[in-house]
Curated annotation (Swiss-Prot):
GO terms for MF: amino acid binding; aspartate carbamoyltransferase activity
Protein name stated in the entry: Aspartate carbamoyltransferase catalytic subunit
Pfam hit, one: OTCace
Tagged with keyword Transferase: yes
Assembly and binders: Heterododecamer (2C3:3R2) of six catalytic PyrB chains organized as two trimers (C3), and six regulatory PyrI chains organized as three dimers (R2).
Binding-site positions, L-aspartate: 94, 177, 231
Pathway assigned in UniProt: Pyrimidine metabolism; UMP biosynthesis via de novo pathway; (S)-dihydroorotate from bicarbonate: step 2/3
């Protein structure tokens, strides 16, 4: 068992609240550190001691399987004492404000808090009220930085680079924090980004984020190296954004016919959870061009890298 990685990278930030604000050097450093953890996680002994004696609280106000489990595994493999707080047991359901919750948790002296919340900006509010480091595990439609990092790692490992690639992000861009974080990261790293969706699922002024816009799959996937599908986030929809699920799949669901519009060696990604038969069919999701399972594996490595990089900034680290 070793206590540290070969990489000496230290993230120049106390928190990870978003991709926005990270430099190219920050992103590259996190991806390089993640590579070390990919190899560690494939060994029999997956333990490190770099977070021994540290307390990590996973604070999830929205249901999560992949992200919460991934952060829990990441923390435990680094030797942290990990506590998962369920929203059903939180005092916020009894009327306590988020600020009160933050101050209560801060009194327990956690070193790292990992938070997911349905409100954009909630994680930043928490970060202003606590002494430890805060990681954004998704806040509303704002950002999901570790998802963008694991997506970038997956792409880089399979394509050898990010610079110059064309990444088509397809589906419910309007409600997607994953799309926003990926757009920021991919643009920073020199990739071309094209968003593909019906007009009702595109944020107004999305072009200002430096993306190309297409409103049908033939145009959208033309020349794409990576096809990243997004699910319909019906829990965030207050009205009718698509006529029907079947019609949406007909025009925007990824099947073999539509995938053929992309480059022959194009690879398929999805942040999960997938709605099979809505934005993607099973043949493509489980096919040879799919990286979806690999994304899950990369998630643990990336979150280990983020936890260690932030822990190196903690007092007495």
């Amino acid at each position: 068992m070793t206590s540290s990685t070969k990489s000496s990278f230290v993230l120049g930030h106390r928190h990870l609240l978003g991709i926005e604000g990270l430099s190219v050097a920050d992103i590259t450093g996190l991806l390089d550190l993640s590579e070390e953890y990919v190899e560690l996680n494939r060994q029999v002994d997956k333990k490190r001691t770099s977070l021994r004696g540290r307390t990590q609280i996973n604070l999830f106000f929205e249901a999560s399987t992949r992200t919460q489990s991934s952060f829990e595994i990441a923390g435990k493999r680094l030797g942290a004492d990990v506590m998962n707080m369920s929203v059903s047991s939180m005092s916020t359901r009894k009327g306590e404000t988020l600020v009160d919750t933050a101050m209560t948790l801060n009194a327990m002296h956690p070193d790292i808090l990992v938070m997911r919340h349905s409100a954009s900006g909630a994680v930043e509010l928490l970060a202003r009220k606590v002494d430890g480091s805060v990681i954004n595990a998704g806040d509303g439609a704002h950002e999901h930085p570790t998802q963008a990092l694991l997506d970038a790692l997956t792409i880089r490992r399979n394509k050898g680079r990010l610079d110059g690639l064309l990444v088509a992000i397809c589906g419910d861009v309007l409600h997607s924090r994953v799309a926003r974080s990926n757009i920021i990261l991919l643009n920073a790293m020199g990739a071309r980004v094209r968003v593909v969706a019906p007009s009702t699922l595109l944020p107004p002024g999305i072009e200002r984020m430096g993306v190309e816009v297409a409103r049908d799959m033939r145009e959208g996937l033309d020349g794409a190296d990576i096809v990243m599908m997004l699910r319909l986030q019906r829990e965030r929809m207050s009205g009718s954004f698509v006529p029907s699920v079947s019609e949406y799949f007909h025009y925007f669901g990824l099947d073999q016919k539509k995938l053929a519009y992309a480059k022959p060696d194009a690879l398929v990604m999805h942040p999960g959870p997938m709605n099979r038969g809505v934005e993607i069919d099973s043949i493509v999701a489980d096919g040879a061009q799919s990286l979806i399972r690999e994304q899950v594996e990369m998630g643990v490595a990336v979150r280990m890298a983020v936890l260690e990089a932030l822990a190196r900034n903690l007092p007495n680290a």
